[in-house]
């Protein structure tokens, strides 16, 4: 919430787990930057921190709400999701299943990116292929609207049988 890329946090753990967690932390980055920790402690305890958090909430709420509206408008018949109360992502599941990795290739060709959801599950199972994670933190509301329109087109094209005419009378190849 203050310095992008700075990761400061804490873990509450049993006394037995502590030495393992210390080794895990040390094996990843040795230690967190002390100046960063000092700055973070000062900032989160400052009188301006609550106002800063409210600005961030308003900023991301606008984008979340824009994505919710765009999803409803463009993907309401194709997918299901729950609007997040926190975080920066929507988890979307295609109603008729599918392979979001294959969709990603087509979406990237049209300059739209998302993360196939399968990578976030502990075991690779075909039923997880219908999930995707959509990030709303970087795009403007206008970009989100455009991105969801393109994504809906890509999903519909992907579902059209090869060589069959689609609703516009065009042949899918």
Can you name each region flagged by the protein language model?
Residues 109, 125-173:
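PLP-dependent enzyme catalytic core of the Aspartate aminotransferase-like
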């Amino acid at each position: 919430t203050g310095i992008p890329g700075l990761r400061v946090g804490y873990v509450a753990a049993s006394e037995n787990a502590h030495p393992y967690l210390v080794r895990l932390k040390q094996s990843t980055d040795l230690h967190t930057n002390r100046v960063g920790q000092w700055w973070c402690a000062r900032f989160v305890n400052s009188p301006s921190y609550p106002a800063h958090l409210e600005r961030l909430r308003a900023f991301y709420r606008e984008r979340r709400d824009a994505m919710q509206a765009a999803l409803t408008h463009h993907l309401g018949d194709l997918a299901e999701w729950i609007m997040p109360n926190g975080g920066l992502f929507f988890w979307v599941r295609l109603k008729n299943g599918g392979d979001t990795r294959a969709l990603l290739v087509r979406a990237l060709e049209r300059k739209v990116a998302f993360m196939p959801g399968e990578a976030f599950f502990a075991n690779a199972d075909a039923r997880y292929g219908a999930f995707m994670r959509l990030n709303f933190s970087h795009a403007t509301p206008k970009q989100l609207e455009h991105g969801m329109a393109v994504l809906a087109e890509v999903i519909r094209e992907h579902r059209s049988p090869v060589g069959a005419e689609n609703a516009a009378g065009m042949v899918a190849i």
